[in-house]
Amino acid sequence: DVLLDAAAFAPTNRLDLSQWQPDFVDLSFYKMFGYPTGIGCLLARKRAVQRLRRPWYAGGTITFSSVVAEGHYLTPGAAGFEDGTVNYLGLPAVELGLKHIESIGIETIHTRVQCLTGWLIDQLVALRHSNGRPVVQLYGPVNTYRRGGTVQVNFFDPDGRMIDCLDMERLANEARISLRAGCHCNPGAREVALGFTRDDLAACFRDQESRTFEQFLQKIDGKTTGALRASVGLASTFADVYAYVQFASTFIDRPAHVV
């Protein structure tokens, strides 16, 4: 069975399921129009759902269960996989959001996001310190070919020292710019991009059953563990990306220890 993760793709692109024919497709309505949080969906072929078997069950997913007889019957179809009470107060917002996207047109959204993202990338990679060194390092393509609206970077001072992404997130928030810092649910990509080795990280999982994030940072000698992410989407405007570039330009010739 094939699962297509379209959560990041679908909000700004038309997904052609006649060309790609997976068994399952997951979507996030929050990523599409920003509200409501915590609601997504799994599109599934009927024959694929019939092959699924659950090792446990929760409320709302069974037709009958017995403790004495130690048995249960799973609700047929998709309902057998919807644990608990669905968010019936938030679901009407999904219908309104989909109608809003339909009224604009996904192609229009795609073109707009592509233009804003392309301009943002061009401006960020062009930033230079007086000595010619780049202010930011961009992860991923330097153009919009095969790229969505997510722009991930790290900032560097004139001496090439990386400025911690958590500090950058804090400063951006103070400037009323919403950025996210971290590994963004993709630790493997983070480790490759930042050059962490197996030996660097294996020590973090020795000797202790658990470790706080602060203890983790101490174990890797305070190295930056992520990057700074800006997401361009349906609600983004040119004023948004322009404000980010203006903010980024304030780090030209700015030493890391001053941040």
At which residue positions do the language-model features occur?
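Pyridoxal 5′-phosphate
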Residues: 1-259
